[in-house]
Each structure stands twice: as C-alpha cells, then as structure tokens.
Amino acid sequence: MAGAKEIRSKIASIKSTQKITSAMEKVAVSKMRKAQLRMAASRPYAERIRQVIGHLAKANPEYKHPFMVERPVKRVGYILVSTDRGLCGGLNINLFKALIKSMKEWHDKGVEADFCVIGNKGASFFRSYGGNVVAAIGNLGEEPSINSLIGSIKVMLDAFHEGRVDRLYLASNKFINTMTQKPVVEQLLPLAASDDEGVQKGTWDYLYEPNAQQLLDALLVRYMESQVYQAVVENGAAEQAARMIAMKNATDNAGELISDLQLVYNKARQAAITQEISEIVGGAAAV
C-alpha cells in the first residue's frame, strides 16, 4: 500500500485537475449557448434562399443549372467539417467513422474521392489516414466568418462545375440537443428537388431582375456557401456540447477517484497509527 504522504500528494494533484475540468465545463456551457444563437440566426437565411431557388427552378423548368443535373459518378468530393481542438469526447472520431463508411461504399464501386477539410482535427486525420486533400482551412475561431470559408468552398464547387467531381457531400455533426450530437454525411450536389410546401403550391408571384436564370446561377452558389457555413456553426455548437459533457464526466470521475483515495489514505493512516501503538506497547512490555 502506498504511503500516506504519497496518497496526499496524489489527492492534491487530482483536485487541481478537477478544478481545471470544472472551469472548462463552465466555459463550454457559455460558448455552447453563444454557438446556438449563431446557429439559430443563420438558419433563416439558408432556408429563404432554398425557397427562392425552389421557386425559380419550378418557374423555369427548361433551364437546368449544372448544380441541378445528375450525371454518372466517376469521382466524388467531400467537404469535412471538424473541430480545431480536442477534449470533446468522440465527436470527431464518430464523424470520421461516418465519412469512412461513405468513402468505402464509393471505393467498392471503383470511385475515388477528393476532400476539402475544415478544422485542424480533420487535417490531422487525413495526414495519418491518407486522401487527396485539395483544400483545407483551420483556426476559424469561436465566431467563424463565411468570408473565411468561401475560398475553400469555391474549390469544390468549381470541381463539380467543371466535371472533376460528379457528386459533392458535406460531412459534419448535427446539434440535436445538449446531450446528443449526430454525425451526418449529406449530399450537397447535385441539388435535390425542393419539397417545400410553399414552393409546391406555387403561391409566389415575383418578378426577377435582370432575369431568373442569372439570379438562379448566383443564388445556387450563395446557397452552397450558406449550407457549409450553417454546418460549421452547428458543428461548433455540437463541439461545445460534447466538450461540456466530457469535462463534466471528467470532473465527476475525479470526485469519485478522490473519494476512493481518501478512503485508502484513511486506511493507510490508521495502519500507521496502529503500528505505532503496537511498537509503543511492545517497548513498554520489554521494559
């Protein structure tokens, strides 16, 4: 059994770590709430663009933008949204597993992939796993800007437009609630037909200038950018929620470990006192 002094030192060390994890939990709660607000603020913009695109496409069925045309798949592209930092449980690992599953399905069909990586953890993953990374960006901070993402997104959109990739996916974590984050791999391009009720009913009657086709060309690019930005913001909220849970579990585990060590310390101290008493009694008897 370890000595009382050694156990005391270990308890003090764990208490110090517990204070750090507790503070990190509180910081994560605050950051998660801010990320949720950003997520809620950006969603209406993306939804409205989607509705307008759906209306434009329905009103001009003869015009087919390349982003809306299905074609035989010879190569696919992925935009991966990961975190810049760790200490967020299995958030990134679960996302990488979902991505690898999708990649394997295409690889089995003889289809290779290109990647755009957002976040340092994703870049680290591809350094060890391998893959054709054509664009990468990291260190976006707590409040990512869509302007920071446009360059990397454009690389993948141009690749699709020029026929270098035939299908484009977005891999990120969905923020379901504080306790649940879900890794998803969703198809970005070609864009699926809208199932929005307002679009299907055809209740809108707008005039578009300079013309509907030019507007559709511009809006489709903006929509793709907004979808990726929304994924980055939502992934940020999922990251903070996962970090909050991880730090709470670490704090709770530290508390349990301290209790166990305190019990061991008390037993060690009791054994030491008992031994001292035995030695005193033995010495007195010898006299």
Swiss-Prot record:
One of its GO terms (molecular function) is proton-transporting ATP synthase activity, rotational mechanism. It is a peripheral membrane protein. It is found in: Cell inner membrane. Keywords: ATP synthesis, Cell inner membrane, Cell membrane, CF(1), Hydrogen ion transport, Ion transport, Membrane, Transport. InterPro entries: ATP_synth_F1_ATPase_gsu, ATP_synth_F1_gsu, ATP_synth_F1_gsu_CS. Its main location: membrane. One of its GO terms (cellular component) is plasma membrane. Coiled coil: none annotated. SUPFAM superfamilies: ATP synthase (F1-ATPase), gamma subunit. One of its GO terms (biological process) is proton motive force-driven plasma membrane ATP synthesis. NCBIfam families: ATPsyn_F1gamma (TIGR01146), PRK05621.1-1 (NF004144). Produces ATP from ADP in the presence of a proton gradient across the membrane. The gamma chain is believed to be important in regulating ATPase activity and the flow of protons through the CF(0) complex. F-type ATPases have 2 components, CF(1) - the catalytic core - and CF(0) - the membrane proton channel. CF(1) has five subunits: alpha(3), beta(3), gamma(1), delta(1), epsilon(1). CF(0) has three main subunits: a, b and c. HAMAP family: ATP_synth_gamma_bact. Belongs to the ATPase gamma chain family. This is ATP synthase gamma chain. It comes from Azotobacter vinelandii (strain DJ / ATCC BAA-1303). The gene is atpG.
